[in-house]
A protein has these predicted regions:
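Glycine-centric low-complexity repeats
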Residues: 1-266
């Protein structure tokens, strides 16, 4: 059977409930989400773990509260995928993705950090690792968009998760957050967030691509994320592009037996 979902918080300063764990076969429950306008601190609940033999991890809960983080995705069992991390809407970090199955399975994707009101630059959650023999790493979440003057600049993207031990690609790094939103007439100063780094591949597989730097509203240079490297057979990930003349990320190294190096970011 599956684990139960964590309770949601419709409003107020409280954390969402954690999702329940499955036992032998079944998926973990999703973490509870926190809603309403930001009136306090309330983190998204963590996802439950999948069953020991087979089952996906539950997704982390999301939050609309300020200074609060999205929940972490649950870990998979022997076979299954890790849960995705929850997003954070104001001044908080996206939740990390859960790990893939201990034999076969993909890591969960990291949650996004949507925007900052100017106090904290939230970063995207890191993608979960594939910890078994076969599976891909999860993608990193996007960094927060800068909308305030107290902490100028966008948030950094999350790093991609690593591929499985034998066969698997590294996850892509998340993109950095911008400092100019189309609906905002006056650009916010500062560089866009740094792109996340791509994950490392398994023995066979490609490294993840680095995330792009966020777009700056005033032309401040921003940096792209580095591409992940391959190990034995596979191509290195491409570096993420920089912004406003900032450096792109370096390309990852190709496999020692066969593979090409990733291209540097422009």
């Amino acid at each position: 059977g599956n684990g139960g979902n964590g309770g949601n918080v419709p409003s107020g300063a409280a954390d969402g409930g954690a999702g329940g764990d499955a036992r032998l076969i079944g998926n973990g429950g999703d973490g509870g989400s926190v809603g309403a306008a930001p009136t306090g601190i309330g983190n998204g609940g963590n996802g439950g773990n999948g069953g020991w033999l087979y089952g996906d991890g539950g997704s982390g809960g999301s939050t609309l509260q300020g200074f609060s983080d999205g929940g972490t995705g649950g870990n998979a069992g022997m076979f299954g995928d890790g849960g995705n991390g929850g997003f954070s809407f104001f001044d908080g970090n996206g939740g990390d993705g859960g790990t893939g199955g201990t034999l076969i399975g993909n890591g969960g994707d990291g949650g996004n950090s949507v925007q900052t009101d100017g106090f904290l630059r939230g970063h995207g959650g890191d993608g979960g690792n594939a910890v078994g023999l076969i599976g891909n790493g999860g993608a990193g979440g996007a960094g927060s968009a800068g909308t305030g003057v107290f902490a100028p600049g966008g948030g950094s993207g999350g790093n991609g998760g690593n591929g499985a031990l034998l066969v698997g690609n590294g996850g892509a790094g998340g993109s950095g957050g911008p400092t100019q939103i189309p609906s905002v007439a006056v650009p916010v100063t500062g560089a866009g967030g740094t792109g996340g780094n791509g994950g490392t591949a398994g023995l066979i597989g490609n490294g993840g691509n680095g995330g792009a730097a966020g777009v700056s509203g005033d032309g401040t240079p921003g940096t792209g994320g580095n591409g992940g490297y391959a190990q034995l057979i596979g191509d290195g990930g491409d570096g993420g592009p920089g912004d406003s003349g900032g450096p792109g990320g370096s390309g990852g190294t190709g496999g020692t037996l066969a593979g090409q190096n990733g291209s540097p970011g422009g």
